[in-house]
Amino acid sequence: MDRVEEFTGRRVFYVEGVPDPTGGWAGFFAGHFRALREDAWRCADEQHVRTCPQYDAIVVGLPQYVFYGDTRNPIINLLAATTVARAWRGKPLLRPGGAMVLITACDGHIDPDLHPSYREALRLFAATRRAGAVEAHFERLRAQPRYLDMYRNHHAYHPVHPLWLLNESQYVLEQAGLLVFASGERNEGVEAVGATYAADFRRAWDMVLAHCGPSPRTLVLPSYFSLVPMVFDVDATRR
């Protein structure tokens, strides 16, 4: 905004709206952007920042659609896990080596019309569970004629779109010692993204207890993706 004012030679009158967690409005702020910034950010923090300890385990419920598509898609599930695990400041929300459980309808289906390059990217990723293995094929994926045609003429995602998602999702695979997709259907896509399948939550919870020990400190987020996202201010010394 400083550059805008420098270019125009005028002060900018700015209006900022802060949503509440349900998608309504918590407040509106108007004036010069510097003058309203502190009050607007304080309001946003009051609405969306939660102070909490660090957790041994996190359980998250997924809706049918989130971000870029259907949660039947294993890459979309991995991105959802990463989004929650990265929503922190101070210290990581999930302790190193902790466990995450997604309650999801993931059955391995990848929409070939919307995400034509995802299945190939997932196959490349599965070999090492490292995004770099897919990046090595960047130019080939980017220039693949069928993928480009789908992107340019049929409303599909860009051929290299899954590379971006796998890159950022590397975080949860490195932070969590156990990632479980519970419910849905057993499918090879779950293992390909580095997760473990459980037929239901009871079986998933047994895996968590075996991994973390009895009475793990657990954060349960049944409707995280149905609300305006939260940020967790983590105090790792808090008990």
What are the functions of these language-model segments?
Residues 56-61, 101, 219-220:
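Structural motif
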Residues 27-28, 68-77, 110-122, 192-193, ...:
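Short glycine/threonine-rich loop-to-helix capping motif typified by GTGT followed
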Residues 78-179:
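C-terminal catalytic subdomain
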Residues 1-56, 61-64, 81-94:
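Conserved, well-structured core segments that form the ligand-binding/active-site neighborhood
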Residues 23-35, 68-74, 151-154, 182-195:
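Acidic/glycine-enriched edge-of-secondary-structure segments
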Residues 74, 80-81, 199-202:
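N-terminal glycine-/serine-/threonine-rich phosphate-binding loop
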Residues 20, 63-66, 106-109, 185-187, ...:
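Short, glycine-/Ser/Thr-/acidic-enriched flexible segments
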Residues 167-239:
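Extended hydrophobic packing segments that form well-structured cores
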